[in-house]
């Protein structure tokens, strides 16, 4: 569809996404109406109900002292978008939600490499969620909105970038699925890319992928749905390309009509050619030798020594250009690493291209933790720690996403000492949030249902040592820790990071493009390579995937080969993990025991009591924690089984009542004394009377208070229940009680509230 001028200076373009029997979605871009003082602004609509405003601005002067590109992406969730007032104390939006931070990362990853190298002007992209249909997810629309506003801003940007979410539903890849449709999906992918080439040769270069198996994938596959294997994932990447092409075309049409003229922005190359030639002439031989050292610390120490020597030798002829010398040295290092891989299939640490570093796995490493594990892969070391608690400890989420609670929480920590450096510690940075979210998505598909395992689960991954893919190490450590905590996973999950190096290579006088996929990449191979490809999964299918590439597209056969390599590595890692633990352990004695019972919905109020009086009294008397859901599900947690059972019996006495019987015994509490006897609480709302004549053990007493007082515990037996339901009690002799217990007759005598469930009635 061509661009439409809605009014003077206001233009619109549209992309229609046809999903066949799953319906169509319409993405509309508009510019010229809102945020006109920004360098570029655009409003993106999804079916007219979901509306995002994106504004891109650039600083007037470059930060030439920076050695990086200062791009900032912010996503502002406005709660009015969903017709809600923020739940915070001040009733206004504060720090960004996790969803907003993850969306920032989704936008940044394909946008950043699309800017010209050497740009040092500060660029800020702000995406504001202004309206959100509850059936939609806004993150993918935000990628397109950010690309559109940046394309309009007249910046040195090689866009547009298109982003599409596709889900595998009933064997069909559906673009921009609704939340309801995603419940039927087995796999969900966000794919971003841009068009390369012209005319018939035009293709979509995939720049970024974020993918995951859905929460109910195991059940769907068992019911006959297609499993998300490596081959299926590769098909999904191809299926996303037509949708991305349509989105890029709509953006380009609007940019051709309304974009500002390209401005002149100075670029600051990291170094000039003369500096690189000088560095190469003095450092190549020594650096090539240093890069054969297998150990990371020793290798880094030696390359640092060489760098100092180079700076000293070139200090006089290249005075004042020390930063260029440092950048050229890094570029030379990158070239040597890549050349060795491409020509010799030999890596920095001496491994072959498919070799995995030494693996080790150990469980139960933290004494009082509910579950813990230590996973090591080479110099990458991850400690996983699992904590179990009541469902009421699930995270409460106040954001625009469809989730309002999260039962499984995965937190990733990356302290500076993990790389032998100093740095800030404290609240998590965006990278840590992103890595934790990736590991969380990898494990969610294999978690047991809340009915099977009624616990809130917090998983913490501590990166104690880092040299390549701590996020995938976190997946492995977390699987081990969860099993050690007794969590009945549907299947163990492992992860591996893949890399790619490509270049034109002279073979027998002919130049050909060569691609080499690397298994289990080091940190340096990640930095110097063309692709960072993280794959997690079970032995049967992929559960999570993340891809970032610096290339203009990766041939499908290369990607398929990398996926196959990743599966081989994953199976090897799973075997090592199985040697440490291959089934859920017994739960830790320090973990709470949680039992689930069901009560009628109309009895919830009685269980809670006025102002929580009843539920608080049960908690105080038994020591158990109690959480009640709106559907009548009650979670009872306690440090031991006896406390939990006592609480359950008290709840059942209120909500699922049964009449007590003559002869049943109780350990009751004296709640009232009178001239004629003592009233003893047997069950919530059910008291019985011990007559004064029965309190003296055969002796006459003048005053009830001489024998018992309010709060005393008495062992009593029901002697009679009259036709009005009044209960008469007698004391149980201690000798009798003890002999009954020693004989194993504990079923007849109950703790207070542990007898059958009765309807509260007047004693």
Curated annotation (Swiss-Prot):
<dbReference type="GO" id="GO:0006402">
    <property type="term" value="P:mRNA catabolic process"/>
</dbReference>
<dbReference type="GO" id="GO:0000175">
    <property type="term" value="F:3'-5'-RNA exonuclease activity"/>
</dbReference>
<feature type="domain" description="S1 motif">
    <location>
        <begin position="663"/>
        <end position="732"/>
    </location>
</feature>
<dbReference type="InterPro" id="IPR012162">
    <property type="entry name" value="PNPase"/>
</dbReference>
<keyword id="KW-0460">Magnesium</keyword>
<protein>
    <recommendedName>
        <fullName>Polyribonucleotide nucleotidyltransferase</fullName>
        <ecNumber>2.7.7.8</ecNumber>
    </recommendedName>
</protein>
<dbReference type="InterPro" id="IPR020568">
    <property type="entry name" value="Ribosomal_Su5_D2-typ_SF"/>
</dbReference>
<keyword id="KW-0479">Metal-binding</keyword>
<dbReference type="InterPro" id="IPR036345">
    <property type="entry name" value="ExoRNase_PH_dom2_sf"/>
</dbReference>
<feature type="region of interest" description="Disordered">
    <location>
        <begin position="739"/>
        <end position="763"/>
    </location>
</feature>
<dbReference type="Pfam" id="PF03726">
    <property type="entry name" value="PNPase"/>
</dbReference>
<dbReference type="GO" id="GO:0003723">
    <property type="term" value="F:RNA binding"/>
</dbReference>
<comment type="function">
    <text>Involved in mRNA degradation. Catalyzes the phosphorolysis of single-stranded polyribonucleotides processively in the 3'- to 5'-direction.</text>
</comment>
<dbReference type="GO" id="GO:0000287">
    <property type="term" value="F:magnesium ion binding"/>
</dbReference>
<dbReference type="Pfam" id="PF00013">
    <property type="entry name" value="KH_1"/>
</dbReference>
<dbReference type="InterPro" id="IPR001247">
    <property type="entry name" value="ExoRNase_PH_dom1"/>
</dbReference>
<dbReference type="InterPro" id="IPR014069">
    <property type="entry name" value="GPSI/PNP"/>
</dbReference>
<dbReference type="InterPro" id="IPR012340">
    <property type="entry name" value="NA-bd_OB-fold"/>
</dbReference>
<dbReference type="InterPro" id="IPR036456">
    <property type="entry name" value="PNPase_PH_RNA-bd_sf"/>
</dbReference>
<dbReference type="InterPro" id="IPR003029">
    <property type="entry name" value="S1_domain"/>
</dbReference>
<dbReference type="InterPro" id="IPR004088">
    <property type="entry name" value="KH_dom_type_1"/>
</dbReference>
<dbReference type="Pfam" id="PF01138">
    <property type="entry name" value="RNase_PH"/>
</dbReference>
<keyword id="KW-0694">RNA-binding</keyword>
<keyword id="KW-0548">Nucleotidyltransferase</keyword>
<feature type="binding site">
    <location>
        <position position="532"/>
    </location>
    <ligand>
        <name>Mg(2+)</name>
    </ligand>
</feature>
<feature type="compositionally biased region" description="Basic and acidic residues">
    <location>
        <begin position="743"/>
        <end position="752"/>
    </location>
</feature>
<dbReference type="Pfam" id="PF00575">
    <property type="entry name" value="S1"/>
</dbReference>
<feature type="binding site">
    <location>
        <position position="526"/>
    </location>
    <ligand>
        <name>Mg(2+)</name>
    </ligand>
</feature>
<dbReference type="InterPro" id="IPR036612">
    <property type="entry name" value="KH_dom_type_1_sf"/>
</dbReference>
<keyword id="KW-0808">Transferase</keyword>
<dbReference type="InterPro" id="IPR004087">
    <property type="entry name" value="KH_dom"/>
</dbReference>
<keyword id="KW-0963">Cytoplasm</keyword>
<dbReference type="InterPro" id="IPR015848">
    <property type="entry name" value="PNPase_PH_RNA-bd_bac/org-type"/>
</dbReference>
<comment type="similarity">
    <text>Belongs to the polyribonucleotide nucleotidyltransferase family.</text>
</comment>
<feature type="domain" description="KH">
    <location>
        <begin position="592"/>
        <end position="651"/>
    </location>
</feature>
<dbReference type="GO" id="GO:0005829">
    <property type="term" value="C:cytosol"/>
</dbReference>
<dbReference type="InterPro" id="IPR027408">
    <property type="entry name" value="PNPase/RNase_PH_dom_sf"/>
</dbReference>
<dbReference type="GO" id="GO:0004654">
    <property type="term" value="F:polyribonucleotide nucleotidyltransferase activity"/>
</dbReference>
<dbReference type="GO" id="GO:0006396">
    <property type="term" value="P:RNA processing"/>
</dbReference>
């Amino acid at each position: 569809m061509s661009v439409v001028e809605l009014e003077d200076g206001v233009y619109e373009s549209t992309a229609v996404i046809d999903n066949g029997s799953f319906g169509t979605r319409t993405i509309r871009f508009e510019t010229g109406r809102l945020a006109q003082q920004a360098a570029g602004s655009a409003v993106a609509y999804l079916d007219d109900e979901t509306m995002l405003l994106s504004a891109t601005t650039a600083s007037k002067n470059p930060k030439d002292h920076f050695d990086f590109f200062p791009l900032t992406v912010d996503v502002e969730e406005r709660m009015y978008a969903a017709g809600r007032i923020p739940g915070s104390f001040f009733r206004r939006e504060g720090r960004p939600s996790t969803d907003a931070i993850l969306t920032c990362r989704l936008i940044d990853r394909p946008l950043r490499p699309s800017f010209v190298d050497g740009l040092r002007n500060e660029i800020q992209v702000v995406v504001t969620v202004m309206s959100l249909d509850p059936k939609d997810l806004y993150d993918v629309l935000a990628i397109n909105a950010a690309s559109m506003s940046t394309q309009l801003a007249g910046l040195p940007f090689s866009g547009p970038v298109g982003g599409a979410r596709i889900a595998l539903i009933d064997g069909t890849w559906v673009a921009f699925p609704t939340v309801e449709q995603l419940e039927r999906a087995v796999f969900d992918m966000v794919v971003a890319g841009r068009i390369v080439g012209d005319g018939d040769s035009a293709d979509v270069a995939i720049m970024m992928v974020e993918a995951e198996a859905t929460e109910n994938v195991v059940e769907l596959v068992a019911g006959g749905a297609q499993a998300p294997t490596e081959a299926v994932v590769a098909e999904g990447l191809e299926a996303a390309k037509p949708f991305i092409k349509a989105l890029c075309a709509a953006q380009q049409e609007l940019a051709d009509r309304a974009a500002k003229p390209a401005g002149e922005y100075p670029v600051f190359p990291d170094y000039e050619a003369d500096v690189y030639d000088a560095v190469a002439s003095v450092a190549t031989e020594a650096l090539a030798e240093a890069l054969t050292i297998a150990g990371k610390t020793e290798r880094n120490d030696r390359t640092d020594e060489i760098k100092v020597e180079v700076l000293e030798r070139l200090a006089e002829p290249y005075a004042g250009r020390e930063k260029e010398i440092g950048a050229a040295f890094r570029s030379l290092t990158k070239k040597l690493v890549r050349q060795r891989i491409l020509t010799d299939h030999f890596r920095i640490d001496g491994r072959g291209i498919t070799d995995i570093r030494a693996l080790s796995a150990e469980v139960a490493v933290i004494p009082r933790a509910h579950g813990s594990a230590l996973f090591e892969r080479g110099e990458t070391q991850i400690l996983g720690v699992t904590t179990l608690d009541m469902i009421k400890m699930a995270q409460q989420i106040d954001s625009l996403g469809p989730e309002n609670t999260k039962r499984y929480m995965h937190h990733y920590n990356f302290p500076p000492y993990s790389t032998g450096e100093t740095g800030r510690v404290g609240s998590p940075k965006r990278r840590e949030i992103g890595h934790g979210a990736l590991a969380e998505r990898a494990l969610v598909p294999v978690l047991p249902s809340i009915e099977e395992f009624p616990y809130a689960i917090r998983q913490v991954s501590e990166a104690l040592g880092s040299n390549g893919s701590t996020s995938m190490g976190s997946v492995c450590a977390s699987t081990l820790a969860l099993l050690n905590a007794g969590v009945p996973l549907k299947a163990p999950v492992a992860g591996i990071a893949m890399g790619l190096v490509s270049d034109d290579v002279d073979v027998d006088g002919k130049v050909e493009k060569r691609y080499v996929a690397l298994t289990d990449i080091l940190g340096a191979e990640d930095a110097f390579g063309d692709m960072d490809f993280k794959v997690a999964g079970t032995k049967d299918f992929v559960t999570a995937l993340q891809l970032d590439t610096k290339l203009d597209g990766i041939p499908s056969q290369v990607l398929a080969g990398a996926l196959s390599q990743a599966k081989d590595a994953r199976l090897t890692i799973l075997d090592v993990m199985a040697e440490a633990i291959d089934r859920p352990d017994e739960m830790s004695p320090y973990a709470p025991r949680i039992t689930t019972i069901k009560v009628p919905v109309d009895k919830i109020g009685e269980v809670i009591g006025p102002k929580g009086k009843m539920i608080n009294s049960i908690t105080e008397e038994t020591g158990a924690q109690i959480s009640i859901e709106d559907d009548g599900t009650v979670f009872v947690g306690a440090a031991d089984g006896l406390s939990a059972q006592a609480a359950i019996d008290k709840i059942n006495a209120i909500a699922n009542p049964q009449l007590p019987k003559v002869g049943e015994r109780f350990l009751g509490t004296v709640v009232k004394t009178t001239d004629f006897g003592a009233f003893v609480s047997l069950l919530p709302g059910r008291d019985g009377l011990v007559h004064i004549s029965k309190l003296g053990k055969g002796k006459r007493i003048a005053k009830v208070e001489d024998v018992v007082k309010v709060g005393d515990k008495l062992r009593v037996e029901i002697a009679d229940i009259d036709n009005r339901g009044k209960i008469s009690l007698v004391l149980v002799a201690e000798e009798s009680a003890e002999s009954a217990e020693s004989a194993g007759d504990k079923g007849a005598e109950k703790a207070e509230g542990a007898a059958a469930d009765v309807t509260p009635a007047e004693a």
